Every structure is written in structure tokens, then in C-alpha cells.
A protein has these predicted regions:
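Short, charged recognition helix plus adjacent turn
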Residues: 83-114
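DNA major-groove recognition helix of helix-turn-helix/homeodomain DNA-binding modules
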Residues: 66-84
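Short alpha-helical DNA-recognition segment
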Residues: 37-55
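Generic structural marker for isolated residues within well-ordered, non-membrane alpha-helices
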Residues: 28, 39, 68
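The alpha-helix within a helix-turn-helix
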Residues: 32, 43, 72
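N-terminal flexible/basic segments that precede or flank functional cores
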Residues: 1-35, 103-107, 111-114
Length: 114
């Protein structure tokens, strides 16, 4: 690992955490717009309710494996890309939850004693 003198590893661009995590729904929304396809048309193609798809696109609901595979089949967006985005989003959201991070700290303190 190359380190720069006087530069905190947290301040190197590759180590920065984005201010706002990217939910996979944003990618789906952008692709729909670029292809001039409506949310309702995609929902119909993959056999889900328009409200379910809208919740994913708005970031209110996560993308699971089945949904990722259906979107891949309909739009040729790799399912693993959607799942990786979802996983990174979930991780960043958990790490930004102060209450949860305090809980983790407490668990680590207890585990250190064991």
C-alpha cells in the first residue's frame, strides 16, 4: 500500500465515502429515461405491480435477487451490478446510522473481553 506523507488515508479519493449512497433504483430510473420506457411498461414486462417498481426506483425498497434477475432479463442490466449497488447502499446506510454504530461498538467492547 502506498501512503502519502502528511495525508490521512481517509482523505485519499479512493477511500472517500460518497455523501449520498447510490441506490440501484437510480440506475434503473436513468436507464428507463435513456430508453424512453415508462415504469409501468417495465413493471408489465417483468410481471410486478407498478407501485412495487416505483418504490424501488424511489429508493424506498431494495432490489433482491429475483428482481435483479427480472430487470436483467428485461433491460440487460447485469443483475450482479444491481445487487452490488444494493449491498453497497445497505452497508453505507448502516454505517451512517449512529445508533447502530454505537451498538456495534458495544458489541466489539464485549467481544474484546471474551
Amino acid at each position: 500500500m502506498i501512503t502519502l506523507q502528511g495525508v490521512s488515508p481517509d482523505m485519499i479519493a479512493n477511500n472517500l465515502t460518497p455523501f449520498q449512497p447510490t441506490h440501484p433504483g437510480e440506475l434503473i430510473k436513468d436507464e428507463l429515461e435513456a430508453r424512453h420506457v415508462s415504469q409501468s411498461k417495465l413493471a408489465e414486462r417483468i410481471g410486478v405491480s407498478p407501485s412495487l417498481l416505483n418504490e424501488i426506483i424511489k429508493g424506498k425498497r431494495g432490489v433482491n435477487t429475483e428482481m435483479a434477475l427480472m430487470i436483467e432479463a428485461a433491460m440487460d442490466i447485469p443483475a450482479d451490478l444491481l445487487l452490488n449497488l444494493q449491498s453497497a447502499y445497505n452497508m453505507q446506510m448502516a454505517k451512517s446510522d449512529i445508533s447502530f454504530m454505537k451498538r456495534l461498538s458495544s458489541i466489539r467492547n464485549i467481544a474484546a473481553i471474551l
